[in-house]
Amino acid sequence: MGRRPARCYRYCKNKPYPKSRFCRGVPDAKIRIFDLGRKKAKVDEFPLCGHMVSDEYEQLSSEALEAARICANKYMVKSCGKDGFHIRVRLHPFHVIRINKMLSCAGADRLQTGMRGAFGKPQGTVARVHIGQVIMSIRTKLQNKEHVVEALRRAKFKFPGRQKIHISKKWGFTKFNADEFEDMVAEKRLIPDGCGVKYIPNRGPLDKWRALHS
């Protein structure tokens, strides 16, 4: 018997059921890589950020996440070059789905018990997503805005339900507005740290603040 279609597991009906010592024998998720492109690009290299945002409360299978990741990556590599972007899949499939296998061969009615003992065996994993939750983000240079929108639009077709594409007002993957970001870096209130930044508050020892601004 093959894998059951993902439409059977689309809705969030039950409580989260993660892999644990009580829920064993869970097959590995199809998606293993969540960051691709130029992951180590400094925060000031990729100011533009686009998000794919879910418009439904549903479950997305690990196979669908992997298909969307491959689709977006292939388009971005073709249009921006392999070092011109950074894609991050923001969902992780932790919820385990089950299947109560039924025999469909001749004489199966003598072997199986129908709905007696119907708690199934683990079949795969899905990610539970809420309305307004980000599924996938891409950061890149400002001139690649159309390519980001097109890559996310193509990746949308791999998912059920409805998603929206949103170009963020923030700088890259940070939580600071793009129009304030460069001023805050110049004032040394933000220190670039990989693909993120460290925020330096105006509190703390005065000599530490003087050493930073000297």
From Swiss-Prot:
Residue location of crosslink Glycyl lysine isopeptide (Lys-Gly) (interchain with G-Cter in ubiquitin): 188
MF annotations from Gene Ontology: structural constituent of ribosome
Broad class of where this protein is predominantly found: cytoplasm
Modified-residue entries (Citrulline), positions: 32
Crosslinked positions (Glycyl lysine isopeptide (Lys-Gly) (interchain with G-Cter in SUMO2)): 175
Entry comment on modification after translation: Citrullinated by PADI4.
Family indicated by similarity: Belongs to the universal ribosomal protein uL16 family.
Protein name per its UniProtKB record: Large ribosomal subunit protein uL16
